[in-house]
Amino acid sequence: MIAMNYRSLGARPGSLKKPFWREYGEALFIAFILALVIRAFLVQAFSIPSGSMQPTLLIGDYLLVNKFSYGVRNPLTNKVWIPLGMPQRGDVVVFIFPQDPSKDYIKRVIGLPGDRIQIINKQVHINGKLAKTAEAVYDDPVLIPPPQGPTDSTRDNLGPVVVPADSYFVMGDNRDHSYDSRFWGFVPMDNFLGKAFIIYFSWQGPPNEPIYAAFLGGLKGLLYQFSWSSKDFLIRWNRIGRIIQ
């Protein structure tokens, strides 16, 4: 009797079973929906194509961005549904570039709403005090513009300017080679996508070769990986898992 009851729980001869393609199709569909939800509300991956954030972030770094650091947002309009926090000075953030919404930028938050920002001979002053910018690097001794020269550039001397409400002043750590708020202004709060928090992969390819965002999952990236010699292709193992500060 026990054996009969146990067998009765199994599939009966001739019972209907889902086709192979349907089972895998449903699994792929569920995985796709979960990926969309994670990308829209939780975490999104980005790659670093330029050196404006060196040495904190290098070309070829792949990082994850916490998308709910500053609130749960409408994935279509990027408007905050549920506020959870505000950007803090020193945060490394990804945002929609105000001058071209098709581009995402990554910089460090320097000025908060209401702050008075002034740059004097490369040194950042916030509300009249010299800011602590240990992460910043400079490699060009020339001042642009000179202290008493024409103001056709704002790289090394700027302001003072006051950060508007609901906006932020951002800069790259590679100060002499970063296109940031010194040149195009402030970042509205609605443009923020999230806070960068970890490097999950990092590699260095041949000089002047493009960095493919699809490297980890795309066939083109794999072909490049196996076609390059070991001296041209380098995985930066010491950067994988590094927390972004």
Predicted regions and their residues:
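Soluble "head" domains of membrane/secretory-pathway proteins
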Residues: I2-R22, V37, F41-S47, S52-Q245
